């Protein structure tokens, strides 16, 4: 096969067509995890999900918040993938389901601890000569 006829994988938003009407998980830039049925998308990878839930994980617990129809701006999508329903069930049954109202404060606390650890690690790395992303001396 010569270079002119070589098959190139389709990596634009058009590659989402295989996921339409399937259950997907979408991870957003802010860390939210959305699970729903992908109903539509456009050339900017803006997504429309139906029967959407936001799933919160904390340690060995999880909680779901019903979000219904959810529109996601494409630039906020970090990851999108089809869910294997059997594997999802097997994975979730190893966790304890909790009311999302109880998990939300715990998730916020975990997130703050994570940010604090990242800041401390950044300070240490800066003290030994490394540049920290987003720091005042980061010129990129």
From Swiss-Prot:
What functional role does this protein have? Component of the cytoplasmic LSM1-LSM7 complex which is involved in mRNA degradation by activating the decapping step. The LSM1-LSM7 complex loads onto the 3'-end of single stranded RNA.
Q: Which Pfam families match?
A: LSM
Q: Which domain of life is it from?
A: Eukaryota
State whether keyword Nucleus applies: yes
Give the UniProt family note: Belongs to the snRNP Sm proteins family.
Gene Ontology terms describing biological process = deadenylation-dependent decapping of nuclear-transcribed mRNA; mRNA processing; RNA splicing
Q: Which cellular components does GO assign to this protein?
A: cytoplasm; cytosol; Lsm1-7-Pat1 complex; nucleus; P-body; ribonucleoprotein complex
What is the protein named? Answer: LSM1-LSM7 complex subunit lsm1
Q: What is its main location?
A: nucleus
GO molecular function terms noted in the UniProt entry? mRNA 3'-UTR AU-rich region binding; mRNA binding; poly(U) RNA binding; RNA stem-loop binding
Q: Tell me what organism the protein belongs to.
A: Schizosaccharomyces pombe (strain 972 / ATCC 24843)
